[in-house]
Amino acid sequence: MHFSKKCSVFKVVLSALLIVALLQLLYLSFLSKLHGKQQRYKYSELFGSKKNANQGEKNPRREHLRYSLSTGGIFDGSGQYRVYKNLIKSDFSTNQKPGADPRSHHLALATHTTINNLHHLESLLERWKNPISVAIFANGEDVKFATAIIYALSLFCPQVQALVDFHLVCHSGEMATFPDQDREHFVGLQEMGCPAVFAKLESHRDKYKNYAIGSNVSYPNNLLRNVARGGTDAAYILVIDIDMIPSANLHHQFVTMLMKREPAADEVLVLPAFEIRHIRKMPASKPELVQLYQVGEVRPFYDELCSRCQAPTNYSLWVNLASKSSGPLEVSYTINWVDPWEPFYIGARSVPLYDESFRQYGFNRISQACELHIAGYRFSVVSNAFLLHKGFKVQGEFHSRKDEENRKNRILFRSFKESLKAKYPTSPRRC
């Protein structure tokens, strides 16, 4: 009898525990469904679902993205790449009046990148604070991620929304699609905002080395430069790599200079390019830069890899020139182009485009500088502005096929120089 009572009590306790466990499971299931419903609701707010497509106020940014993607983009001249121009437009570009004088939009910055380097946009925009046109190359699964992250940047980052135009380039056999099903890319972003989007980009920075995107995948750097250039209506454009930063107030200095004099039709304004150790804070002015230059923390761009490629800039002369950090840009001296100089410059939008047959590593920028020279341009070096590359360029950091690509593009460059003779038959200049 005593044993029977014990057994009954045990059954009651066990039953109670089972009921409690079952209730906990039901509660957790309910919470999970509720969380999923909340996430779906938040996601539908971002991208819109078929159910709520006609309800409430439309998101013009989302609708523009949908339209841009629905066009399927356009093929480049080679037919190997698909280009989505103005995938997302900035508020600045959207508010530009059709037919407005391009001089009212004086200077824009054009740049190019893959997803693994797009995180540099944050510091670039923080320094530049003016219109930027960004051409992004994506391959494979990155096409879907790039589309999603571009939209997130434009949605959650006010400065990006205000000033950055995005263009997307992928292989012709791939297509960008609206990120309806990509919830995993956006979990938590709405609550945490812009810092979370750039943190997500940071997690992709080591996905692959520059130019080592995948087997049989060529980074079309000159196509991207042209897409970024063509994506702005500015009268003048500065084309740089996304891991470079201009000196502070460059845009204001240039606009102030225009009040006194415009560059001649055959003139580009060269910005001396430097590179700095990763651990250093980025100098904003020439005095700050020169101080670091004198102690070896800053050196000419490509100093270790190809000192001849930037030597014509005449860094020793430039460093010792007295100049004002504020006020208009000042032209200090003019240089005739010599091989193999690869200057970075501010040029009119009429400057010849980059030759898009150059891809991967080698001769992609020098080919365009060579054409400027043959076309009769002069290179005027400014004394109070500069560009800075993040980190020293060293031999060991490059991908394994760099030398092979360089040899291939050297052969292409020889052919390109011959074609310039036919394009500019009356020019006495040669590269």
Curated annotation (Swiss-Prot):
GO terms for molecular function: glucuronosyltransferase activity; metal ion binding. Disruption phenotype: Muscular defects and reduced alpha-dystroglycan (dag1) glycosylation. It is found in: Golgi apparatus membrane. Residues 1-11 are cytoplasmic. It catalyses: 3-O-[beta-D-Xyl-(1->4)-Rib-ol-P-Rib-ol-P-3-beta-D-GalNAc-(1->3)-beta-D-GlcNAc-(1->4)-(O-6-P-alpha-D-Man)]-Thr-[protein] + UDP-alpha-D-glucuronate = 3-O-[beta-D-GlcA-(1->3)-beta-D-Xyl-(1->4)-Rib-ol-P-Rib-ol-P-3-beta-D-GalNAc-(1->3)-beta-D-GlcNAc-(1->4)-(O-6-P-alpha-D-Man)]-Thr-[protein] + UDP + H(+). Mn(2+) binds at residues 241, 243. Its main location: Golgi. The chain crosses the membrane at residues 12-32. GO terms for cellular component: Golgi apparatus; Golgi membrane. Its cofactor is Mn(2+). Pathway: Protein modification; protein glycosylation. Residues 33-431 are lumenal. Coiled coil: none annotated. It is a single-pass type II membrane protein. GO terms for biological process: muscle cell development; protein glycosylation; protein O-linked mannosylation. Its EC number is 2.4.1.-. Beta-1,4-glucuronyltransferase involved in O-mannosylation of alpha-dystroglycan (DAG1). Transfers a glucuronic acid (GlcA) residue onto a xylose (Xyl) acceptor to produce the glucuronyl-beta-1,4-xylose-beta disaccharide primer, which is further elongated by LARGE, during synthesis of phosphorylated O-mannosyl glycan. Phosphorylated O-mannosyl glycan is a carbohydrate structure present in alpha-dystroglycan (DAG1), which is required for binding laminin G-like domain-containing extracellular proteins with high affinity. Belongs to the glycosyltransferase 49 family. This is Beta-1,4-glucuronyltransferase 1. It comes from Danio rerio. The gene is b4gat1.
